[in-house]
């Protein structure tokens, strides 16, 4: 099993990533040199632990956003996703296909002028038991 990382290691790695993200890579040796340059770390062992966890987090960041870490590129990507507007609005179509419950909800909210086509709900498949 792996070792448990201390709060100091995790916090230091997060700070290093937030401040120096463009310089960091997925390579431990490179990250070790960068951590050594940008931070004053008392021991070689602690420096290596911070560099190792930084490399681990960088690999996780490649797959998607990581909780607790925000840097400029990630913020810009999040803003871009939040500001996304589709080319054609779903409500601009001639008719919107909805079920009866959705039509009733639209009517109660005052959107009864939207042309809708009520479809019968699709029958749900029941699970088959193994024999």
From Swiss-Prot:
GO terms of molecular function: structural constituent of ribosome
PROSITE patterns in alphabetical order: RIBOSOMAL_S17E
BP GO annotations: cytoplasmic translational elongation; ribosome biogenesis
Function: Component of the ribosome, a large ribonucleoprotein complex responsible for the synthesis of proteins in the cell. The small ribosomal subunit (SSU) binds messenger RNAs (mRNAs) and translates the encoded message by selecting cognate aminoacyl-transfer RNA (tRNA) molecules. The large subunit (LSU) contains the ribosomal catalytic site termed the peptidyl transferase center (PTC), which catalyzes the formation of peptide bonds, thereby polymerizing the amino acids delivered by tRNAs into a polypeptide chain.
UniProt family annotation: Belongs to the eukaryotic ribosomal protein eS17 family.
Note: There are 2 genes for eS17 in S.pombe.
Protein name (Swiss-Prot/TrEMBL): Small ribosomal subunit protein eS17A
């Amino acid at each position: 099993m792996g070792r448990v990382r201390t709060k100091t290691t995790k916090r230091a790695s997060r700070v290093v990533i937030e401040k120096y993200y463009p310089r960091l890579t997925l390579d431990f040796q490179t990250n070790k040199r960068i951590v050594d340059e940008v931070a004053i770390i008392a021991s070689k062992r602690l420096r290596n632990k911070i560099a190792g966890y930084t490399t681990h987090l960088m690999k996780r960041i490649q797959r998607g956003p990581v909780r607790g870490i925000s840097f400029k590129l990630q913020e810009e990507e999040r803003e871009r996703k939040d500001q996304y507007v589709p080319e054609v609005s779903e409500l601009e179509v001639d008719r919107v296909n909805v079920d009866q419950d959705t039509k009733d909800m639209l009517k109660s909210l005052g959107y009864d002028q939207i042309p809708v086509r009520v479809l019968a709900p699709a029958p749900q498949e029941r699970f088959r038991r193994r024999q």
